[in-house]
């Protein structure tokens, strides 16, 4: 049927139809060349020494972690990315168009997409992409390797809690800087420069912002900090977590739970000799402490990988508060609280054992 109609049409109509088809193809090619750039890599950010387990069934707070996509809100790249299922997760809007620069340019508006020959010379072109209000830590199935870019180290800083004879240098990753300039801390250039041990200079803030801008991080000029400065503000995450692990080890080995539990039990029974009442109170206390410890083990903040994680679901509103505490203490809070609660449970267990061992069996009949 198509061949018959083609034979019936005149030569002029055939030429005009061919020209229309060529114009349509040129229009499609022009539109495809102006297609907005997508992310070349969708990143998961956490310190390089941590293991992050990606589970899509984990409820994350909307402002912190939001599966199943992954990336950073201000980490934007203007490189070509093949069309995939990731488009449904990103509400990408066309960036501002720029005039083509250089000799031989047509002057038409187009997106600043780097050419293949310029891949190795990133300084020769400008990277233009949109910035979306996305959570700063999230996961995706499109990631080639969750730890592929996690270990990007921005710099190393000397520890603030080390002795002069054994100064330890801690790594500061790009992910940590993103967390520090994001809520709840929202550090400004002055505080961030002090944490990174950058020397104060006339253009120190501008230099820091420019270096972060090359990594895709945006640090606004003149911003004010939102959270109060504490002793943990001066620590980097790796040092804070190192302190937490040492604190947990000291609690396990140096906190004498047995002796303290027996002493408290003797003191309480000397005031009120009701053994049944005392044992019931200890059982209820242990239950409450266990519930709190189980809740902390459900924390899904990326800075809490050093204790076994409970896979029970957790309410997003509660996860938001746990993440706030963990981010304010840079990973120290959750680990330290878990260590303290474990010591308290051991103390309660020793108190119950002492009551069962030393008190008369007639009491329980």
Swiss-Prot record:
Biological process annotations from GO: positive regulation of transcription by RNA polymerase II; regulation of cell population proliferation; sleep
UniProtKB keywords: Activator, DNA-binding, Nucleus, Transcription, Transcription regulation
Chief location: nucleus
Name of the protein described by the UniProt record: Transcription factor aptf-1
Encoding gene (name): aptf-1
Subcellular location: Nucleus
Native species: Caenorhabditis elegans
Assembly notes: Binds DNA as a dimer.
Function comment: Transcription factor, which is required in the single sleep-active ring interneuron RIS for sleep-like behavioral quiescence induced by neuropeptide signaling in larvae. Regulates gene expression of sleep-inducing FMRFamide-like neuropeptide flp-11 in RIS.
Upregulation: Regulates its own expression during larval development. Transcriptionally regulated by transcription factor lim-6 in RIS interneuron in all developmental stages.
């Amino acid at each position: 049927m198509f061949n018959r109609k083609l034979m019936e049409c005149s030569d002029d109509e055939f030429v005009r139809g061919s020209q229309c088809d060529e114009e349509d193809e040129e229009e499609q090619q022009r539109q495809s060349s102006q297609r907005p750039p997508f992310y070349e890599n969708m990143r998961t950010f956490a310190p390089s020494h941590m293991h992050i387990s990606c589970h899509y069934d984990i409820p994350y707070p909307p402002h912190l972690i939001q599966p199943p996509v992954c990336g950073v809100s201000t980490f934007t790249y203007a490189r070509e990315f093949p069309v995939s299922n990731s488009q449904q997760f990103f509400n990408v809007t066309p960036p501002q168009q720029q005039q083509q620069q250089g000799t031989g340019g047509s002057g038409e508006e187009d997106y600043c997409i780097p050419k293949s020959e310029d891949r190795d010379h990133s300084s020769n072109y400008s990277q233009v992409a949109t910035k979306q209000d996305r959570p700063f830590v999230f996961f995706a199935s499109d990631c080639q390797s969750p730890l592929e870019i996690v270990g990007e180290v921005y710099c190393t800083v000397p520890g603030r809690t080390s002795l002069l004879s054994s100064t330890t240098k801690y790594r500061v990753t790009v992910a940590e800087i993103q967390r520090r300039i994001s809520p709840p801390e929202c550090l400004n250039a002055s505080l961030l420069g002090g944490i990174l041990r950058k020397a104060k200079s006339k253009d120190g803030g501008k230099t820091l912002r420019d270096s972060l801008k090359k990594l895709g991080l945006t640090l606004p000029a003149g911003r004010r900090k939102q959270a109060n400065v504490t002793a943990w503000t001066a620590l980097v995450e790796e040092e804070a977590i190192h302190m937490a692990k040492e604190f947990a080890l000291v609690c396990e080995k140096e906190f004498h739970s047995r002796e303290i539990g027996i002493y408290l039990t003797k003191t309480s029974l000397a005031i009120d000799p009701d053994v049944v009442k005392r044992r019931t109170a200890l059982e209820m206390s242990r239950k409450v402490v266990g519930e709190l410890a189980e809740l902390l083990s459900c924390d899904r903040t990326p800075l809490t990988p050093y204790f076994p994680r409970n896979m029970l679901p957790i309410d997003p509103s509660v996860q938001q508060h746990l993440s706030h505490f963990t981010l304010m203490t840079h990973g120290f809070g959750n680990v330290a609280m878990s260590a303290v609660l474990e010591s308290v449970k051991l103390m309660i267990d020793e108190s119950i054992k002492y009551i069962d061992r030393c008190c008369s069996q007639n009491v329980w009949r």
